[in-house]
Design a protein with these regions (language model features):
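Conserved FAD-binding catalytic core of PHBH/FMO-like flavoproteins
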Residues: 41, 130, 137-138, 143-249, ...
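Glycine-rich FAD pyrophosphate-binding loop
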Residues: 1-29
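N-terminal FAD cofactor-binding segment of flavoenzymes
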Residues: 22-66
Length: 383
């Protein structure tokens, strides 16, 4: 088997996982996992661990336009699936995945360890990558897989070219407790200031308390600053008002956080023996919660192509092997990115003709079940 070193800037500390600190403590960063991602975690043997901690499946999604009558409703029942997806706190996913590492004999975890420099060296007839850490350690490897996030140090050191732009919006995230139960529904309202999403949560694996939601609100910086400066009571009132009281009043909120929104895509996913995946390769607007799912599909595709290459007797950094990964993923990722970009611009436009067409289009699509259900299945990774 291949020898693998997992280098992480931060050593995962399970004592910092909000889930372990009480039922009413939540991680502000959550992911909406699709069926394809859930299947991957099941294959890895960690899905049972995730569900044993806590997560919340959702059977319906309601989307509507604040500036008119346009709305669309997606239902798991309509596409004959048990759910549309599952909301999971990122720290719970990390905890489950880290628990796997002890069972992998050919893997060594190097953390906390930060990469300072990257170079290519001659190794017989081949070339290898040499990583230098901040503490002066040197690591030599046949292939570097950069999965180090949106501000990837490896991508920068390897001088990958990217296309990127700032959305001039920020995402405000927090966790709230609502007056009315979410009933396992995800809610998304498009407002002139930016989309507001309520994603359902459960405080424990066996809980029936459906009054917790993770919120993601896309706002211009000035507006997000106003929201952060509000008192808890003011913010609760503002939030309930902007969701049109679909879940009644907001009864409690946790700490609010803000992070910038930026779209970025690497023009190539590999250079020499460096390969990018996940947010290091592409950063997408959180409009539909697809970022983590795209990254997981990257990981599944890359591991499949590496295994295929090894079976064929190829070097794992062979351009043929990495090229197959790039061809399979770059088009799919770009397609999803442009779809989200189109949605963003469509709902940002507030002129009367566009608003009228937008509302007509949403309501019309809601009545065409074949197209609507195909979109739902595609978003879930089923088609």
């Amino acid at each position: 088997p291949l020898r693998v070193a997992l280098v992480d800037r931060i050593l995962h500390d399970p004592t910092n996982v909000p889930y372990l600190q009480g039922e009413e403590k939540f991680d502000p960063r959550v992911s909406a996992l699709t069926t394809a991602s859930i299947n991957l975690f099941s294959d890895l043997g960690v899905w049972e661990s995730i569900t044993g901690m806590r997560c919340c499946s959702y059977q319906a999604m309601e989307v509507w336009d604040a500036e008119g009558t346009g709305q669309i409703h997606f239902s798991a029942e309509d596409i004959k699936q048990p759910s549309l997806g599952t909301i999971v706190e990122n720290s719970i996913v990390n905890t489950a995945l880290y628990s796997l590492l002890n069972n992998i004999e050919n893997l060594e975890l190097l953390a906390p360890l930060e990469i300072e420099d990257l170079s290519t060296i001659q190794y017989g007839d081949d070339f290898r990558a040499k990583l230098t850490t901040k503490d002066g350690r040197e690591l030599t490897t046949t292939l570097v897989v950069a999965a180090d996030g949106t501000n990837s140090r490896i991508r920068s050191l390897a001088q990958f070219k990217t296309r990127e732009w700032d959305y001039e919006h920020q995402a405000l995230v927090t966790t709230v407790r609502t007056e009315l139960p979410h009933e396992h529904r995800a809610l998304q309202r498009f407002i002139d200031t930016g989309p507001l999403a309520f994603l359902p949560l459960l405080p424990a694996a066996d809980s029936e308390d459906e009054r917790y939601c993770s919120i993601v609100w896309s706002l211009v910086p000035e507006r997000s600053r106003e929201m952060l400066e509000m008192t808890a009571q003011q913010f609760k009132i503002e939030l309930a008002l902007n969701l049109e009281h679909k879940l009644g009043n907001i009864e409690a909120i946790e700490q609010r956080f803000v992070f910038p929104l930026r779209q970025r895509h690497a023009t190539d996913y590999f250079r020499g023996n460096i390969v990018l995946m996940g947010d290091a390769a592409h950063t997408i607007h959180p409009l539909a919660g697809q970022g983590v799912n795209l990254g997981l599909l990257d990981a599944a595709t890359l591991s499949g192509e590496l295994a295929r290459g090894v079976q064929a007797g190829r070097n794992i950094a062979d351009p043929i092997v990495l090229g197959r990964y790039q061809r399979k993923r770059i088009g799919h990722n770009l397609g999803m990115m442009w779809l989200m970009e189109g949605f963003k611009h469509l709902f940002a436009e507030q002129t009367l003709p566009v608003r009228w067409l937008r509302n007509m289009g949403m309501s019309g699509l809601d009545n065409i079940s074949v197209i609507k259900n195909h979109l739902a299945r595609r978003a879930m990774g089923l088609d």
